Amino acid sequence: EGINDYQHISPEQLETLRSGFSAHQVEISVLGCYQDLSDPDAEKRAAAVQNVCRVLGWQHLAGGHCVGSETSYLHLDAEERAARREWMFDSILRIVEAAAKTDAIFAVEPVYWHPLDSLEVVQQLIDHVADPEHLHFIFDPANVLENHNIPHQAKLWNDWLSLIGSRVDAIHIKDFTYGSTGTDDTYGPCPLGKGCIQYDAISKWLHQQNRD
């Protein structure tokens, strides 16, 4: 019997999930519940928040270290991102308030084509929520590296890690290439070290922090 939706997950299924991973010594770093937290439709946005809050209630039962989401499903332009930002702030505040009630952790993932798109907006979110214990981050360098910043990665990664490093619960490691036109349309995944991401600064930070 599978799991069809968030509304009908049982404690028995959560225990099966936890024990199955534990038996093979596999940690559940992120219990994913990726939702559109900035949907302009208030009803859909409320349902997305409710889904994340429901999964936060299962975090400990499932053995997850945090519950994670991005802030949209869509590839948004700058105007669309700005228009959705207040909805995103409100959604995340409600989610973190729910996390605090069960001592869970919500980890949000910045993406440059989503409303949580930059260091400046992340700082605004941190200030708005003001709960370092229950608001953490998933850091995916590939999702915050815009074409114009490719030559400036050492500073970029140091800036990101200075801001959110103490709250990073997971780092996604991958690589990609841009085509000759340097546009998003020519993005292509590739093996680590074969693309444009320079991991030296991130690797150095990980060793300095003694992070797993």
What are the residue ranges of the model-derived segments?
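The substrate-binding groove and active-site-proximal loops of carbohydrate-active enzymes
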Residues: 4, 8, 36-45, 190-193
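Histidine-acidic metal/acid-base catalytic patches
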Residues: 42, 116-212
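A short acidic, helix-capping loop that chelates divalent metal ions and anchors anionic groups
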Residues: 2-4, 37-41, 75-80, 145-148, ...
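A cross-family glycoside hydrolase active-site/sugar-binding cleft signature
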Residues: 1, 29-34, 67-70, 107-111, ...
